[in-house]
Amino acid sequence: MNSVKELNVKEMKQLHGGVNYGNGVSCSKTKCSVNWGQAFQERYTAGINSFVSGVASGAGSIGRRP
């Protein structure tokens, strides 16, 4: 188990870190990188959710005759 130290405001101001956008892309001060596994999974999941939402709302019947 890792030990965790709670930082005060002064200590937090001294930290220099990057940004993780939550979709597989993360950037530091000098470069950005992509975790392709996470990026693909995020995009795949969004596509499936969009498809299912469209079918559930009746968009799947557009262009079909009753």
Swiss-Prot record:
* Cited Gene3D superfamilies: 1.20.5.130
Q: Which Pfam families match?
A: Bacteriocin_II
Listed A to Z, the keywords are: Antibiotic, Antimicrobial, Bacteriocin, Disulfide bond, Plasmid, Secreted
Q: Where in the cell is it found?
A: Secreted
Note the InterPro entries from the entry. Answer: Bacteriocin_IIa, Bacteriocin_IIa_CS, Bacteriocin_IIa_dom_sf
Task: Cite the propeptide residues by number.
Answer: 1-18
Any single biological process term in GO: defense response to bacterium
Which Cys-Cys disulphide bridges does the record give? C27-C32
- Single GO cellular component term: extracellular region
Where does this protein chiefly localize?
A: secreted
**Family assignment from sequence similarity:** Belongs to the bacteriocin class IIA/YGNGV family.
Q: What does this protein do?
A: Has antibacterial activity against Listeria and Enterococcus.
Q: What protein am I looking at? A: Bacteriocin carnobacteriocin B2
